Each structure stands twice: as structure tokens, then as C-alpha cells.
Amino acid sequence: MKQSNKGFDHSYNAQAVVDAENQIIVAAEVTDAANDKRQGVPLGQAALDNLDAAGIERPQAADGTLLPIPNTLDSGYFSEEAVEKLADMGLDPHIATGRQKHNQAPVAPAAGAAPTEASVKEKMAHKLRSAAGKALYAARKHIIEPVFGQIKSARGIRAFLLRGQEKVSAEWQLICLTHNLLKVWRCATRAVAS
């Protein structure tokens, strides 16, 4: 990956999908891709596969049809293809379409449905401007960001110790497993204390 010193380092990009309720890592992968644009779909599929393997049922409507599972991703993951594929998989993607500049006036909330002739990007921007979209996307910083903060700051894991993508991937899986064990242990001790 290109680094700020204008050179290239062999670096890895750690990815994770986290549940909103307990900050349990549901899926984790490592890639050597410099950006996240092509990572949302494989991560979404891995999360669904892991939920299915764990026997966790997807939410259903009263008539038994599967409800889309909301998920939020930052602007680095946005592509029209990703939005469409995630929706086809049974997810309800909320992906930022770009960055808001500092000191920029907030965008007015969206009212009603997006125009039918709007592009995927325009529909996503409209969705994120709705009250529900804003609330869901704002929760993202309380769901995924603390997980990476806990791993990097609280546990001091700032770099991988192994080399080679297969070994680094195994190391990342172990880091995520220990994170999940700590979360489960804390949930269990809170339940016992109650």
C-alpha cells in the first residue's frame, strides 16, 4: 500500500462486522487492498454466513418474509454495485456517499421517498438524510469505532506480528476471538451481578 512517505509498504487492511447490541465481532477479514470499496460485499456475506452457521435466525415479518438487516458503512465502502449487491443479499445498506467538509452547513433532512429516476448514489444520499437514516448512521460511531479503539488502545494491538496474508489473517481472527471472549465474559458477569 502507498504510504505517506511516498513509498510503498506491504500492509494489510483489517476489516470487521460488529453487532450493534454487544459489539461482538460477527465477521472479520484481512485484505491487502489499499481501500475498502470492494470489501463491503464479502464482509456482508461472511457476516450472514456466520449468523446462519451459529443458528441465529434473521428477522422476519409477520407473514414470514425475511426483513432486511440494517448495516452501516463509511464512505470508503460506497459503490453503486456494493449497494445493489448488499440489498440483494438481504441487507439494508446505509453507506455514506462522500465526506462532509468541515464547517459545511448540514444538509436539509429528506422528506418522502427518493425520486424513482434518481441514481443509486442519489437514493442512498436521500436515505441517509431521512430521520431514520441519520439516526442509524450516527449509531455507527458507537458500534464499530469502539471495537477498533479497544483493540488498538486498550489492548495495545497496533501492528500485526506475523508476515504473509494467511498468517496475518489467522492473527486477526485470533485478535477478534479474544475480543469476543472478553465481551461475552463481561456480559455474563453483568448478568450474574444483576
Q: For the regions a protein language model found, what residue spans apply to each?
A:
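Anion-binding and metal-coordination hotspots
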Residues: M1-S194
